[in-house]
Amino acid sequence: MKPSMLSKLDQLAERIVEINALLAREDATANLDQYRKLTREHAELEPVVAQFAAWKQAEEDIATAQELAADPDMKAFAEDELRAARERMESLEGELQRLLLPKDPNDHRNIFVEIRAGTGGDESALFAGDLLRMYTRYAERQRWQVEIVSESPSDLGGYKEVIARLVGEGAYSRLKFESGGHRVQRVPATEAQGRIHTSACTVAVMPEADALADIQINPADLRIDTFRASGAGGQHINKTDSAVRITHLPTGLVVECQDDRSQHRNKDRAMQVLAARLKDRQEREAQAKEASARKSLIGSGDRSDRIRTYNFPQGRVTDHRINLTLYKIDAIMDGDIDELVGALAAEHQAEQLAALGEDA
């Protein structure tokens, strides 16, 4: 093991002893925010320190086996023990390396999923609705909450644009690689000749910003307009100006929200989405600078990248970033995307490990 890695692990082992002492104090819960931070840090460090203890035990087992090997009667047994301990130590070192990879500070956050219809007109809008259902069904499988924050329905069903908020521990860590262009190939319901059409939607997954800590928004930078919410055919039409449009003047970002009958709640939701978009913009700019130095296929965050194709006639879904093709399109459209999510996370981890090797 590299000395730098060993030193880091020693520091973490010392830190968990400190945390245990702090949590054992009688006044540990006097400051609840501090208590939560310590328990979260403890939960993050515990698996690393446990693996490090197992690695040190394997190191001791090697030393013991080497001593035993000096005894002719014990040599065969000692060699078996030595081989097993070395294999165990090598495996644990690889696992420790993975555990020490830098964590994304946004991984635990709730998210906003923004889906926009692109090329393909009505068919693209219908596919936007299908993607929303896919993410909603996935969220339900995770026992997350889903709420529609803003929607712009199309005439034939589906959405020109829709924003959903997904609330659940680790939501961003699971879906952050869904940002990008999603292409669909299928025969539209309106197609009389049975020809396959190609349409596309853009998905943006944004971590929910901490209003106080992450993004400072100057009220002077905002233009807030109120207007009457537009009702769908024959449904309730709001007679008050409850819909809200917020324009962030320095960036030109515009957020509309009209799904609630309360202007106050619509404004709060619009501000949440604006904060998430500003945070997302900042982080993508930072990623772009980093990507100029090191090309990353996964998590480049470029919304113009076509990341996935859904081919209905062939029943397949292909993720172009990792060349993964799955022939279970019906299950995937019903929210069974664990295999895709897991493969993307594994590839990202492999990229991080490769980068660690380059920097070493």
Swiss-Prot record:
Chain positions covered by the region annotation Disordered: 283-305
Subcellular compartments: Cytoplasm
Keyword annotations: Cytoplasm, Methylation, Protein biosynthesis
Superkingdom of the source species: Bacteria
GO CC, alphabetical: cytoplasm
Listed GO MF terms: translation release factor activity, codon specific
Gene3D superfamilies on file: 3.30.160.20, 3.30.70.1660, 6.10.140.1950
Main location: cytoplasm
Tagged with keyword Protein biosynthesis: yes
Residues bearing PTM N5-methylglutamine: Q235
Post-translational modification: Methylated by PrmC. Methylation increases the termination efficiency of RF1.
Listed Basic and acidic residues bias regions: 283-293
A Pfam family matched in the record: PCRF
NCBIfam families: prfA, PRK00591.1
Protein's job: Peptide chain release factor 1 directs the termination of translation in response to the peptide chain termination codons UAG and UAA.
Protein family membership: Belongs to the prokaryotic/mitochondrial release factor family.
Protein name: Peptide chain release factor 1
Annotated source species: Ralstonia pickettii (strain 12J)
Taxonomy of the source species: Bacteria, Pseudomonadati, Pseudomonadota, Betaproteobacteria, Burkholderiales
